[in-house]
Structures are given as C-alpha cells and as structure tokens.
Amino acid sequence: MPDGVGRELPRDGTVLAFDYGEKKIGVALGNFVTRHATALTILPNVSVEGRFQAVGELIREWTPVQLVVGMPVNPEGGEQPSMRLARRFGNQLNGRYSLPVEWVDERYSSRMAAMGGARRGELDAEAARIILQQYFDQLPL
C-alpha cells in the first residue's frame, strides 16, 4: 500500500517502479495522467556502482517525479529476508536521487508475470509493471 500518507501526490509526471532482486532488478514505467504501467527493462544487479549507474541513467532519461519499489512480504504478510534488501534499495534511491519512494506489496507479482505469459527473460520487468499498476490502481481518483 502506498505510504505517502499526508503527502500530496503529483497530478502529472513519470513514475519508475522497481522489482528488486539480488541478481536482477526489473523496471517499469508509467505516469500519473494515464495511470498505465509498461515493462521497461531489466538491470543486472552485480555491484552497487553498476546498479546505481544504470538507475541514474534511467532517471536522467525519464525524469520521474516518483519512484515505487516492490516490498516482498511473505504470503502471510510478514517480514522475510529479502524485504530488508528491498527497503535498503528504496532508501538508497531516495538518498541518491532525492525522489519520493512509495512501497507496494509485491506478493505474487513474479508468479502473476509468469502466468500472464511473460517470457523467462522478461519476468522481472513484467513483475515491476504489475507492481506499478497495483500502485496506480490503489491511488484515489
């Protein structure tokens, strides 16, 4: 669920969403006008420097006003080890780029991506698209 309680959301602008994984990071793109998410790319996650160089290039290219990070909670809604990594990644995004970060429960996003017909090499970007679409769908009109 978005946690920007009390913060006014932009009426316009681009949003980038991330499905953080230890080996790959899926990225999706959308905007506040259409509230439609599109799978964008998959970034290799091999080093901190490489990760943030690639993210920085996307931020310069797309100039987002908001970032969204999937939060991998377990099926019961509780913490799991990968949550800490995703939270750290989102906090680093906020610190490096001074952009607001929202968290979205990403339970089953990868499974939904596979069931939706995404090819194996596109699963992470499609999972990011699902995360971003969930974010848009739960925003007030």
From Swiss-Prot:
It comes from the Bacteria. One of its GO terms (cellular component) is cytosol. GO terms for molecular function: nuclease activity. Its EC number is 3.1.-.-. It is found in: Cytoplasm. Keywords: Cytoplasm, Hydrolase, Nuclease, Ribosome biogenesis. Could be a nuclease involved in processing of the 5'-end of pre-16S rRNA. This is Putative pre-16S rRNA nuclease. It comes from Cupriavidus pinatubonensis (strain JMP 134 / LMG 1197) (Cupriavidus necator (strain JMP 134)).
